[in-house]
């Protein structure tokens, strides 16, 4: 009888380890959109910037002022409102983002219209519409 709790704990630990090693079953589209959404939800805009299409990042690099503005924002909600494929294999997505300005503590909501393109060479989706514009209502 004394061995049963130890056996149970060992079995649970093995099951948890097996779950942690299970390969991702998400497709590249869902994986990219989910990871980007997590970055925005946690106000990790440097991580979200990594999802922006590289040519767009070169044309419009983030300025120091823009990075400082992102630091003033705390995202409180990120809700998918709609998603539709595009004829070229990309994706259009509309998201409602709730945020608080850390200085004023005022919450507001913006609607972010995202455009994503599939990159067959990199085998991933890139955000072609840029990061959300928090300067508008």
What function would you assign to each model-found segment?
Residues 25-41:
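Short, aromatic-enriched amphipathic alpha-helices that serve as compact interaction elements
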Residues 30, 45-92, 105:
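Short solvent-exposed beta->alpha transition segments
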Residues 1-8:
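Bacterial N-terminal signal peptides that target proteins for export
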Residues 37-41, 45, 50-57, 98-101, ...:
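Sec-exported extracytoplasmic/periplasmic mature domains
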Residues 84-137:
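Exposed beta-sheet edge and beta->alpha loop/turn motif
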Residues 20-22:
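Bacterial signal peptide processing site
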Residues 15-18:
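C-terminal motif of bacterial Sec signal peptides marking the signal peptidase cleavage site
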């Amino acid at each position: 009888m004394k061995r049963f709790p130890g056996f149970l704990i060992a079995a649970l630990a093995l099951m948890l380890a097996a779950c942690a090693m299970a390969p991702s079953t998400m497709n590249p589209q869902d994986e990219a959109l989910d990871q980007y959404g997590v970055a925005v939800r946690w106000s990790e805009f440097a991580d979200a910037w990594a999802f922006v299409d590289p040519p767009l990042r070169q044309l419009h690099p983030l300025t120091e002022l823009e990075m400082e503005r992102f630091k003033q924002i705390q995202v409180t909600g990120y809700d998918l409102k709609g998603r539709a494929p595009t004829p070229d294999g990309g994706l259009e997505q509309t998201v409602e983002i709730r945020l608080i300005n850390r200085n004023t503590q005022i919450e507001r909501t913006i609607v972010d219209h995202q455009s994503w393109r599939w990159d067959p060479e990199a085998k991933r989706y890139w955000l072609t519409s840029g990061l959300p514009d928090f300067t508008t209502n």
